[in-house]
Amino acid sequence: MYSAAKAITTTVVHMLVERGEFALDDRVCDYLPTYTGHGKERTTIRHVMTHSAGIPFATGPRPDLRRMNDSDYAREQLGKLKPIHRPGLMHIYHGLTWGPLIREIVSAATGRNIREILATEILDPLGFRWTNYGVAQADVDLVAPSHVTGKPLPAPIAAALKMALGGSMTQIIPFSNSPMFLTSVVPSSSTVSTAHELSRFAEILRRGGELDGVRVLRQETLRAATRECRRLRPDVATGLAPMRWGTGFMLGSRRFGPFGRDATAAFGHTGLTNIAIWADPSRGLAVGLVSSGKPGGHPEAGRYTALLDRINAEVPLG
């Protein structure tokens, strides 16, 4: 699911806030004492959730990816990050750093692994089989591999992508197919799911935080999470694609947005590339859209955005 995982992680974070495990305006360093220096001690969890923590790009030495699941190592590396601006000054999508930060904050605050929390509090009570951060080693061969297709991206977009994600498409995609990544716990990108289960998770959100008798979030919590905190404007980390944000959730819009046109009430998250999970309460719509092709400059890539628009056109506003 790549970054569409962030919709699921955002749900977990707001659930934990609602339960009093931590507050959005708590400082990150109150949970991760190594997250200081270069002004980072002023960073709050809200700054991280809203992509305004000032660390959209991984700075410093390249991390050892073989140690992705090593919390001590992750906290050490996060402590070395140098913000490019003070916390809260601006919003730039944190594609790489968001997941490790959230994982370690949740672990430090609760004493539990975020994968376990997601499973025991949401997925297991609702009978999900395939969804979580990574899969068991025995299930790796069942995961559909991703493929780079089409022409290379235009140079400016390719450069922005490489800066935001730490590599080119031809580097990222093979790594994401590896057993090492597919069994990792990276709340920003390593979630594996199916279209059915993804849309069912979106249905939790569409129904205001409850599904089949399992209450995940109160309606007022979800309303606060989807309240606009960043108006629609281009983001340099997404190739200047216009983005509108709540607290962790991407928000839809009328003309431009991640969920097609005329989707002002929609919220969720997209993933690299042509993957999306969103809920649109105004249409009674919950969507999980998955694909394995990463089309770059392929002439057929426009079919994805056309599909989003078609969904909204076919499902009338309620």
Language model features by range: what are they?
Residues 277-278, 284-293:
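Short, well-ordered beta-strand elements
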